[in-house]
């Protein structure tokens, strides 16, 4: 592993730091070839998404982010990552249009999110688990690499602020989620 990349840690495997492809694994045992830069699971639509963003933007060679496997029930972390790349966050740090139960980005600044949106081309293979199909998409991306995105970007973790009673951000203890993972009520 190249020491200058992937500063936020997490559960992942590094391969070729010069590769333009990173792979996010949702609920799958699939293992990509060692031609990718990094791969690993995504479990949650908040901290997990933050780590994927921070770690992938640290390597400017990564330009394609392939998300594959079956969606995580309730969390919808894969779709939340897709929505973050496409739509960003609102003024309460909620990922716009994300279907997850608690899709809030609380530890990254807007600059890191904008870098993620500009640097990454998302390849949405959510629901696809066929190894040959995923391998083919990876090979297609490797055959048409996008140029390096400039210098490495190291996202700095935002220090948490104390929440106030009238704060509209997610106060996790005040969110009621049904058994399917749908938010039924948010605290006021």
Locate predicted features.
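Generic detector of well-ordered alpha-helical segments enriched in charged/polar residues
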Residues: 53, 82, 114-117, 135-139
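Well-ordered, non-membrane alpha-helical segments in soluble/globular domains
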Residues: 46-52, 101-106, 131-135, 139
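Charge-patterned, long linear interaction tracts outside catalytic cores
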Residues: 132, 136-188
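Conserved mixed alpha/beta catalytic, RNA-binding, or beta-rich assembly cores of soluble enzyme
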Residues: 2-96, 172-188
């Amino acid at each position: 592993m190249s020491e200058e990349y992937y500063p936020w840690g997490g559960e992942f495997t590094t391969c070729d730091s010069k590769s333009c492809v990173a792979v996010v694994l949702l609920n799958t045992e699939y293992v990509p070839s060692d031609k990718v830069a990094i791969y690993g699971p995504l479990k949650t639509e908040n901290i997990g998404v933050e780590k994927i963003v921070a770690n992938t933007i640290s390597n400017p060679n990564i330009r394609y982010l392939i998300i594959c496997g079956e969606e995580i029930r309730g969390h919808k972390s894969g779709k939340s990552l897709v929505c973050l790349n496409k739509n960003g966050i609102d003024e309460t740090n909620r990922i716009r249009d994300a279907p997850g139960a608690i899709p809030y980005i609380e530890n990254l600044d807007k600059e890191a999110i904008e870098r993620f949106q500009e640097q990454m081309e998302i390849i949405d293979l959510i629901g696809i688990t066929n190894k040959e199909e995923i391998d083919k998409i990876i090979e297609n991306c490797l055959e048409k690499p996008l140029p390096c995105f400039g210098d490495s970007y190291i996202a700095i973790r935002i220090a948490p602020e104390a929440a106030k009673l009238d704060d509209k951000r997610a106060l996790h203890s005040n969110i009621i989620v049904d058994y399917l993972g749908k938010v039924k009520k948010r605290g006021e």
